[in-house]
Amino acid sequence: MTVKTRFAPSPTGYLHVGGARTALYSWLYAKSQGGEFVLRIEDTDLERNSQEAVDAILEGMQWLGLEWNEGPYFQTQRFDRYNEMVDKLLAEDKAYKCYASKELLDEVRAEQEANKEMPRYDAEHPKIKAANEAAKDGDPCVIRFRNPKEGSVVFEDQIRGRIEISNSQMDDLIIRRTDGSPTYNFCVVVDDWDMGITHVIRGEDHINNTPRQINIYEALGAPVPTFAHCAMILGDDGAKLSKRHGAVSVMQYRDMGYLPVALNNYLVRLGWSHGDQEIFSQEEMINLFSLNAISKSASAFNTDKLLWLNNHYIKTSDPKYVAEHLQWHLDQKDIKTENGPAITDVIKLVGERCNTLVELADQIGYFYQDFDAFDADAAKKHLRGVAKQPLEVALAKVEALTEWTTENLHQVIADVCTDLEIGMGKIGMPLRVAVTGGGQSPSVDAVMQLIGKERVVARIKMALAFIAEREANA
C-alpha cells in the first residue's frame, strides 16, 4: 500500500501557523513512508472563500518548501461527483430528504433545551415527522445522512489511542443543503476515498467530525483511513494561539525575516520530538518522523526559541540559501547588490550577528549604498578633532595599498597605532564610523575589504570633512 496524506485548508484566510504545522506533519509522514502528499482546497464555503486566500495558501506552502505530488484539487470543481454519491446513498436508503424549516428546527431545539434534553435533530420528533409527511415533491429540502442508531464508532487515533463515540450521541448530518451544495463532512469523505488518502493528519478540533465521517465512509463502502489528531498550539500565555499573540500567518514570518528552514524546524518540534535533539535537517526530519512520537498535549509557541533557531540557520546555512531569502528584504529597502561585494561574502561576515533577515538587511546597506550623513550619536562620540590625525594617516596608508586584502588593512590599522602611539580604539572606532556611517559593525578591516578601496577612501575623506566642519563651527 502506498501511503498518501493530504493537507486540505479552507481558503477563508491566510495559511496560519497551526495549518502550516499540520501540512508539515502530513508532508513529513508521506515522505518518511515513501508515499505521496496531496494538496486539496476545501472551498465549499462559497460566501467566505476568496482567490486571495487561495493564493496566500499556495504562496505559504511554496515558501515552506512543502511541494505536493498531486493537486491542488478544488472541491467546487467536484460537485457533480458529490451529488452522484448523495444520490447513491438516497437510492440505498442511507440518506433521506428532510423538509423541516430552520424555524421549525429552532422551535424543536428550544423545546429540548427547556426539557433539559441534549439539543439535536430528531427525525422522529412529532413536529419534524409531520413536516416531512406533509411535504410535496419539489418543496425545498436538505438531504440528511441516516446515521446508525445503535452501537459505537471506534477508531485508533495514532496520537491519542483508542477513541469510542456512541452513535446515540450523533444526529443525522446534513450532507446536501437546500441550494444543492454538498456539505464539508460529506465532501471530505468522498475526496479522501477518490484520492486514495490512507492517513488523515489534522488538528484536534476535527475529532468530533471523525466518527461522523467514519459512518459515511462505511455507508459508501469506502476504506476508512487512519487518523491522527494533533493538539492545539498555545500562545506563551497558555491561551490558544491567535492574532493577539503577534504573527500567526506563515508569510508574516517571512516578512519578519525568518528562514523557511528555521520555521519548519521550529514547527516540527512544536509537538513532535526525537530525544533532546533540537536541530533537524530536512533529511533528518524525514528519516526520524513518526506519528506516535507526537505529543497529546498542547504546545506553547515560544518566539525566543524560534529566534534562536533562526540565528542558528542564518549562521550555518549555505550563504547562497540565505541570500535567496534575503533578496526579498533587500528589495523592500531598494538595496541593489550589483554595485558592491558578493552578497554571500557579506552574509558570511555579518550574518552571525543577526537573529532575522530584517536585521541582516538593516545592517548591510553601507556595503552597497553611499550615505551623506553619519549616525548622529556615533559621529558625536567618535568623529572629533582627536580623530583627525589618525584618520589622515590611515587615509594615506589606505591610498598607498596595492593589494586590497583584509590582512593588509589590518596591518594599516596596526601601523597607525604604532606610528601615533595610540590604542586601537583611537583609530578603530573613528574608522568604523567613517566607512559604515554608524558605530556597530563586524571587524573593520574585513568590512573595509568588502566595501572596496574607492568607497573606503571617499568615506574617510567625508569623515575628515565632517570633523573639519565641526571644528570650524565649534
Curated annotation (Swiss-Prot):
Monomer. This is Glutamate--tRNA ligase. Pfam families: Anticodon_2, tRNA-synt_1c. Keywords: Aminoacyl-tRNA synthetase, ATP-binding, Cytoplasm, Ligase, Nucleotide-binding, Protein biosynthesis. Belongs to the class-I aminoacyl-tRNA synthetase family. Glutamate--tRNA ligase type 1 subfamily. It is found in: Cytoplasm. The keyword Transcription does not apply. It catalyses: tRNA(Glu) + L-glutamate + ATP = L-glutamyl-tRNA(Glu) + AMP + diphosphate. A motif ('KMSKS' region) lies at residues 240-244. One of its GO terms (cellular component) is cytosol. CDD domains: GluRS_core. Catalyzes the attachment of glutamate to tRNA(Glu) in a two-step reaction: glutamate is first activated by ATP to form Glu-AMP and then transferred to the acceptor end of tRNA(Glu). A motif ('HIGH' region) lies at residues 9-19. Its EC number is 6.1.1.17. GO terms for biological process: glutamyl-tRNA aminoacylation. The keyword Transport does not apply. ATP binds at residue 243. GO terms for molecular function: ATP binding; glutamate-tRNA ligase activity; tRNA binding; zinc ion binding.
